[in-house]
Amino acid sequence: MSKKEIVAMILAGGQGSRLGVLTKNLAKPAVPFGGKYRIIDFPLSNCSNSGIYTVGVLTQYKPLKLNEHIGIGDTWDLDRRDGGVSILPPYQKEKGGDWYKGTANAIYQNIEFIERYDPEYVLILSGDHIYKMDYDKMLEMHKQKEADATIAVINVPMHEASRFGIMNTNEDLSIYEFEEKPEHPKSTNASMGIYIFNWKILKKFLEEDELDPSSSNDFGKNIIPKMLNSGKKLIAYPFNGYWKDVGTIESLWEANMDLLKYEDELSLYDSEWKIYSANPVRPAQFIGKDAEIKSSLTVEGCIVHGKVENSVLFQGVYVGKGAIVKDAVIMPNTKIEDNVLIEKAIIGSEAIVCKGCKIGDGNKISVIASKEVVIGSKEIIEECAMVK
C-alpha cells in the first residue's frame, strides 16, 4: 500500500438505543434520512468531496444493512485498489478479541489498518451526524497552527451547552480546557466529535490509554483530557454550517423537517457538494388525480393518491385514497392504505398502516417500527395494535 497523507476512520458501530424501534434491527448510521439517503452517506460523501479516499468504517451493532449499503464504495468513488473504503468490524486476534469498548478503543483495535498507509494524520468521524463539511479546510488549519490535534466545534445556545462536551479556547483558538457536559458552561463551543490528529502522537496516547484499567477508552472522556494535561497543542476549528446529531427520535424528525424549510441550511441541492447514496432504480413517482402535495419531499417510486403535507416520503411509499399524511417521515416501501390519518410521526421501512387507522395527535412524535402492520385506530401510537 502506498503512503497516504491522511486516513479517515468513521465510527459507525453505535446501537442508537435512543431511536427505539427504528434501530431494533439496524445500526444507527444505516437509518434512512431525507427521502433518498442513509445517515452514513453524509460522512462518506464529505470524505469523497474533500479528496480523502482512504476510509475505514468501524462497524459493530447490526451491521448487515450498513455493510450492504456501503458495498465496495463505488457510490462515493471509494472503490479503489490502493485505499478506498474498508469495513472494519471487531475481530479475533492472536491474543483474543473483544467488542469495541469505546471510541478510542475502536481506533486502537485498528492500529494495524492505519499503519498500512503510514499516514501523517488521522481524521476521526462519527457515522451518525447530518452535516456537510470540507475536511480539507480543517486539515489546512491543523497544519497552519502546527497543532497536535484539531477539534471541530459548533456554537450552540448557552441553555443547550450543558448537553455537549465544551471546548474552552483562547483568542487564537487554542483549547485550554475541555468540559464534558458541564452544569455551568464557560463557553458555547460544542465538540462535534470530529478530530484530526497527528498519527504518531495519537498512536502513543491510544497505547497508553489501553493500559489504563480505569479508562473508559473514549476520546472525549479520556484521550482529549490526557492530551491537554500533557501540554499538547489542541486547536478548535469553528464550523458555521448545518449540523445535527440525529441520535434521538426528536432530532431525527426535526432534521427531516428542516429539509422542508424555504431556506434549507443543509441544501441537498448544492451541485458543488453533493451527497451520494446507493439507491435502487425506481420508476418515476405517480401523483393521482385527486392527490394533493404541499411542502414535501417525494422521490422516485412513490405513488400518492391522498394528501401529503410537510412530509418526507422515501422510495416506494404508497399513499392511498383519502389518506392524510402531515408532518411525517415515511421510510422506504411503506404502504399507507385508504383513509389513514398520520400526523407528526416516523413510520419505519416496509410497514403497512391499514385502512382507517389514525396515528399521532400532532403533539408528540409517534413511531412505527419497520415491517410492522398497524391494524388499530388509535390517536397515540403506544395504543395502536401492531402485529408482525
Swiss-Prot record:
The gene is glgC. It is an enzyme of class 2 (transferase). This is Glucose-1-phosphate adenylyltransferase. One of its GO terms (molecular function) is glucose-1-phosphate adenylyltransferase activity. CDD domains: ADP_Glucose_PP (cd02508), LbH_G1P_AT_C (cd04651). Belongs to the bacterial/plant glucose-1-phosphate adenylyltransferase family. NCBIfam families: glgC, PRK05293.1. Involved in the biosynthesis of ADP-glucose, a building block required for the elongation reactions to produce glycogen. Catalyzes the reaction between ATP and alpha-D-glucose 1-phosphate (G1P) to produce pyrophosphate and ADP-Glc. One of its GO terms (biological process) is glycogen biosynthetic process. Its EC number is 2.7.7.27.
